[in-house]
Amino acid sequence: MKNTYNLRSIAAKAISQVLDQGQSLSAVLPELQKNISDKDRALLQELCFGTLRVLPQLEWCIQQLMARPMTGKQRVFHYLIMVGLYQLIYTRIPPHAALAETVEGATVLKRPQLKGLINGVLRQFQRQQVELLERAVNNDSHYLHPSWLLARIKQAYPAQWQQILDANNQRPPMWLRVNRQHHSRSEYLELLTQADINAEPHPIYRDAVRLITPCAVNHLPGFELGWVTVQDASAQGCVDLLDPQNGEQILDLCAAPGGKTTHILEAAPKAHVLAVDIDEQRLSRVKENLQRLQLQAVVRVGDGRAPDTWCGDQQFDRILLDAPCSATGVIRRHPDIKWLRRDRDISELAQLQSEIIEAIWPKLKHGGVLVYATCSILPEENQQQIAAFLQRHPEAQLTETGTTAAPGKQNLPHPEDGDGFFYAKIIKK
């Protein structure tokens, strides 16, 4: 039966919602994917994520092919052309099919009179493709990052910035977290081998396994039974560092979507865990993850800057603060971050992080452990944040993660390793 929808027009609308309305792709896509097949769902995701990953290159190509950009109500057709270009450059979709479906998107978007224009631009690109892509390599669009972020990464990592950009521009690896309540990691690796799924263990993080080739979760042995969870290796490092113990009172702050909450309980099933997040909608994901893994935690809505409103005078043995951040370490998973973030956001986020860590510090027992973590690679949110905190609090002692002069541990994104992540483990003396 022929599909009644046009994927290219759906992708163009999704990209419009990201770039013109400031919505995240992860918020936009689920609604748009509701009535389409699993196979087409994967293609839609590829068209959206891929187009946003290489946006500057596609934008530059359009500038060479069109006298003036499409604006206002016609902007969505600008994105439709981008989706067409992405298919021609980066996918194995036969060019005639890519063109036909993209051009037909104009009819679905109720501007059939633009079909000729869109067809003409895409065919012109086909004729000039080799020359245009060679020229694109010689300008800043080649880096596929906004100029403000490129400048910050170069400044922070003068010797490594190129590798960071390369990692950001690649598809992310698929990491699993083995539930140690069901199997050891070596046992689960054997199950993967039996299922003809190639995988390897992480050299540092004890529950982490990388799939050599990503696959759908329904192909993973025991996924529905809670034997395994999809979670990046660097994110798993937070709980390894926290080292939760049975019987302890543990706070997971900024907990949604619940990956770290459930990891804490897999590591210490008799711990008493309070999971708190300011976003009530995202907390439903925490509950879903707890349910799938058959784990129990108290889940509450709350602002990290006002802990008295959600925990009263309760104190904790361990606190995991996965602070709100720029998410510049997970760009390869969420390429829309490059276009949703602004330079001014960084200082605002650093201020918010400072307010949260100050507010939550009194809730940690003496002798207790706080792990501060972000999925950022920017020093203002990480080393500088922790250096300032240690200066304000002589009773705070850094352990296992750097020195007072160079506080914390910074992971950078790597094609065969985890995302960009920062950790600081602090004991209250």
UniProtKB/Swiss-Prot annotation:
Q: Mainly localized where?
A: cytoplasm
The active site of this protein is located at: C375
Q: Keywords of this protein's UniProt record, alphabetized? A: Cytoplasm, Methyltransferase, RNA-binding, rRNA processing, S-adenosyl-L-methionine, Transferase
Q: What's the EC number here?
A: 2.1.1.176
**PROSITE patterns listed in its UniProt record:** NOL1_NOP2_SUN, SAM_MT_RSMB_NOP
- InterPro entries per UniProt: MeTrfase_RsmB-F_NOP2_cat (IPR049560), MeTrfase_RsmB-F_NOP2_dom (IPR001678), NusB-like_sf (IPR035926), NusB_RsmB_TIM44 (IPR006027), RCMT (IPR023267), rRNA_ssu_MeTfrase_B (IPR004573), rRNA_ssu_MeTfrase_B_ent (IPR023541), RsmB-like_ferredoxin (IPR054728)
The biological processes this protein is annotated with in GO are: regulation of DNA-templated transcription; rRNA base methylation
Which GO MF term does the entry hold, naming one?
Answer: rRNA (cytosine-C5-)-methyltransferase activity
Q: What class of enzyme is it?
A: transferase
Q: Do you know which CDD domains this protein is assigned to?
A: AdoMet_MTases (cd02440), Methyltransferase_Sun (cd00620)
The entry marks the following residues as binding S-adenosyl-L-methionine, namely: C254, A255, A256, P257, G258, G259, K260, D277, D303, D322
- Give its localization: Cytoplasm
Q: Which reaction does it catalyse?
A: cytidine(967) in 16S rRNA + S-adenosyl-L-methionine = 5-methylcytidine(967) in 16S rRNA + S-adenosyl-L-homocysteine + H(+)
Family under the similarity heading: Belongs to the class I-like SAM-binding methyltransferase superfamily. RsmB/NOP family.
Q: Which NCBIfam families match?
A: PRK10901.1, PRK14902.1, rsmB
What role is this protein assigned?
A: Specifically methylates the cytosine at position 967 (m5C967) of 16S rRNA.
Q: Which HAMAP family match?
A: 16SrRNA_methyltr_B
Q: What is the protein's name according to its record?
A: Ribosomal RNA small subunit methyltransferase B
Q: Which organism is it from?
A: Yersinia pestis bv. Antiqua (strain Angola)
